[in-house]
Amino acid sequence: MMSNVETIKVVPARYPLRAVGAVVALFVLAVVIQSVAFNPRWEWSVFARWFFDPVILEGVGQTLLLTLIGTALSVVFGGMLALARLSSSWLLSSLAWGYIWLFRSLPLIVVLIILYNFSYLYDTLSLGVPFTGITWGSFETINVLGQFSTAVVGLTLVQSAYTAEIIRGGFLGVDHGQYEAAAALGLPAWRRTVRIILPQALRTILPSGFNEIISLAKGTAMVYVLAMPELFYTIQMIYNRTQEVIPLLMVGAAWYLVITTVLSAIQYGVERGLARSERRSAVNQNRTLSRTRSRSVTTTPAQEPVHASLS
């Protein structure tokens, strides 16, 4: 008996609008590249002359240093704020909420200016009992905050508020059953957090956290109000002297692109490494489970069948 087998021809789906959109996008990209590359008013020769200038590189170094220190301090302080927000103590939770609400509401430039004028607002700081006039010591604030320290403190205060919410969201994203399972192991609270909860929370924290680091790197441009020679203020000083505004702004834009590209590459590598580690852990866990099952099967004695007899 012969079977009738029909050959099914698979026809790929066609998306004409997608092709039209790609052509339009390529056309617009070509127009933009031509207008930017061949317009003499962009002054690319000036751009090339200043891009690796030692003064510019020093400004880039200051920007990277502010980003590194601000990130480290905001992660530490933001982590403490996140734990306070998750605390069962209403006082700690309320204080952390108030801090986060305040510094997420204030623009960074306002915080920097207030900190820079701190010695004007408070010429001396005293330690004592409030509302009694009893003081144990005091010191002048005239030289407490310089340009660099003001920039670091301002960036940390503002950035830690955003970092705290990111870390808190990561902990809340962990399934509640994981907390119960960790508590059942009888480990101390800090070990449960570091060894069990935090690795799972990092999957949620890392993408948003790196976005905040990139925002912080660009936000360092706000410290120009302190006359600190980071990248943007250095470029301002140069183009105020040479009147070559556009090419020097392009130098700054290019360096910010380089910084954010490097940070994005680091983010990609960290996320891939974390995913690879999770896959290895899952494979090892499955192997351990299969070995445990095989051992239980081999060690369990075979039961002889029970035969019923009629007497």
PLM feature segments, named:
Residues 1-311:
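Transmembrane alpha-helices and adjacent helix-loop boundaries
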